């Protein structure tokens, strides 16, 4: 990931959030955990982060699940929205600057669609849905590399595309809203584009995030709408994370092959998944296995020990090394960053390593020795000076137990 941050200090950033009809799986957290770490690295360099994250709380899947359970869409989405917020806390992910539910902004979304209609980018399809005409956008395909010719509908003599997408779906099934376009609800691509347009006051984002699976059609269609209204791309920089597979197979609810984030947190230290996600370059697929989890469990224990050892040897951190590693994370060069961390570990640069871990927001960096325990380090130092190593080891072991349980 290469970001153009020249002459910028305030960054506007957006990440598509979950569709809240069920619990999120561990793969859903890859982008937001990476963002959480990168944002802290950027703040360390003096950047201010304005981060918008949406909650999709109206969708066909939500309606179907609510009807299946015999409850309202609002009851269902409130439950899973709150569950998602709990997950963010458990995995030590800072809440975004602003979280917005789609249903809170229906009027703004309708206004957005009106602007697209007024500018002549829409038509009604055979179902009487209001649809966006992608052929009106000369650079459609610029985000995903799609060729417009390949998207044309052969049955309409090349005047329409199979990929024209719904702005407003006409329906009275489940939750619906009044609008000039009829009773219905907005399309997913339009929800995100409208929220970005409204919250960031028509400006292009500095960074838009999401999974690689969203490049087409979602990101392409967001960009098309923003370009239609402003003549500018929706984002100057894109960050996309690769797939997270489980035991060699795609992790997906539809395939019944998932590891829920809450189940992961019950079984493992949440820092383990942060370590995994920050060890592999963002776009590279990850195959989550017991062996990989076990390896990173050992790594986290090693990192914890380094933070403990810092109390016994608080030499000055090497600021230039901290900056070098954090810059690599910002650039998405995670493998190189981790190589440098391992070199610093060999050199026993505990202060430098601890500073890096603080910026990557590992939960174990909150582990502390209280003032009373730190006083015991003075006794430890004296015992070392007196070459009473057995008693010194006892104090060290006692302090390690206190540190681990802090």
From Swiss-Prot:
Binding site for ATP: 253
Record's keyword annotation contains ATP-binding: yes
Amino-acid positions noted as binding Zn(2+) in the UniProt annotation, renumbered to this chain: 16, 192, 218, 222
Enzyme Commission code: 6.1.1.16
GO MF term set: ATP binding; cysteine-tRNA ligase activity; zinc ion binding
Span of the annotated motif 'HIGH' region: 18-28
Catalytic activity line of the entry: tRNA(Cys) + L-cysteine + ATP = L-cysteinyl-tRNA(Cys) + AMP + diphosphate
Protein's UniProt name: Cysteine--tRNA ligase
The organism's taxonomic lineage, starting at the top: Bacteria, Bacillati, Mycoplasmatota, Mycoplasmoidales, Metamycoplasmataceae
Gene: cysS
